[in-house]
Amino acid sequence: MHGLVTGQDPRRRRGDLEVKLENPIGFFESDIENTPEVATGMHRFDGGIEFYNAMLKNYTTTDMTADEIHQLGLTEVERLNNEMLKIKEQVGFDGDLQEFFTFIRTDEQFFYPDTDEGAQMYIEDSKKYLAFINERLPDYFGILPKADLVVKRVESFREQDGAAQHYYPGTPDGSRPGIYYAHLSDMTAMPKNEMEAIAYHEGNPGHHMQISIAQELDSVPEFRTQAGFTVYSEGWGLYSEQLAKEMGAYQNPYSDFG
């Protein structure tokens, strides 16, 4: 917020902040002149580069530079494109990869009806995918969560503006289950070919196992059982998507593509 971080007395800064919070619309209207027409990132501020690098380290827990992370991203995009090309050939699609993307995004076979009934079908099929993987978890993991996992549609009061599919933790003692929430206000935004991977990412063996087992640890300080690092949590989610394939999931090649 422009103008708040200054050399002023802390009590005066607090007073300025309280005024701005009491009249947020007025503040934002007056602050428009400090906003560039084109977003240019943190580097335009004093100390911006240092701040950006600190955030990179916070999210990645590494000393990788922005250029190194960008190059890693390009390498991964190339690898994933090659995998997707193989699936395109497997299903016999006659066209390039971009045309295949368009086909999957527009063909009605990949979508449930945009109705409450269609949303319930999405929930039930997600439960089936998780039931399939849950049967195989003991063969791959020596420790399983105490808390059960349930699948729910995001509640109507927060569905319109809420986040996409996400996970909400249960309790460490297992008395309340973890919840995989599916955001289904617009079924055209939730294609069938992506739902299996999302179920494994958010549920098992993904965030439900990752967060639940961490919460249950009694050999570390409690604050460490609640700490979260994006590179680990989302890395585990992506690993879980791949592990599910090794466990026999994605029998439909379109789900593998998703």
What positions do the PLM features span?
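N-terminal maturation segment of proteins
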Residues: M1-G258
